[in-house]
């Protein structure tokens, strides 16, 4: 029986699943928005929300925990310098998952995952082109 097992296996071994979710977490922190399948997006939310909560408290122990989960020094620096202060007053709910329809090849449900309260880059582009 599968009762009370909340983990999605995503048809992968545990090491592949861990590596995939770690890579997706680093990509989301780097670009602040990614496109993926809906089940992967929902599982990514379970991984990245506690990491973003770690970034709100700047301590050596939290930095070591974040590095242990991310394995990317540049993203740990961004997490504590930029993202932690941005979400200091928000208690969870750091991600927005938007459904995007279905993938052409296999009809898999797709999702757009982005960090909430991310700065708009389109306004800066429009301001530069107007000058």
Swiss-Prot record:
Which domain of life, per UniProt? Bacteria
User: Would you kindly state one Gene Ontology biological process term found in this protein's UniProt entry?
Assistant: translation
Would you tell me the Gene Ontology cellular component terms?
A: cytosolic large ribosomal subunit
Under SUPFAM superfamilies, the record lists:
Prokaryotic ribosomal protein L17
Keyword line: Ribonucleoprotein, Ribosomal protein
PROSITE patterns in the record: RIBOSOMAL_L17
- A Pfam family cross-referenced in the UniProt record is Ribosomal_L17
Database matches in InterPro entries: Ribosomal_bL17, Ribosomal_bL17_CS, Ribosomal_bL17_sf
An example of a GO molecular function for this protein is: structural constituent of ribosome
Q: Which family does it belong to?
A: Belongs to the bacterial ribosomal protein bL17 family.
Q: How does it assemble?
A: Part of the 50S ribosomal subunit. Contacts protein L32.
Protein's name in the database: Large ribosomal subunit protein bL17
Gene source species = Janthinobacterium sp. (strain Marseille)
| Biological classification of the source | Bacteria, Pseudomonadati, Pseudomonadota, Betaproteobacteria, Burkholderiales
The gene that this protein is the product of is rplQ
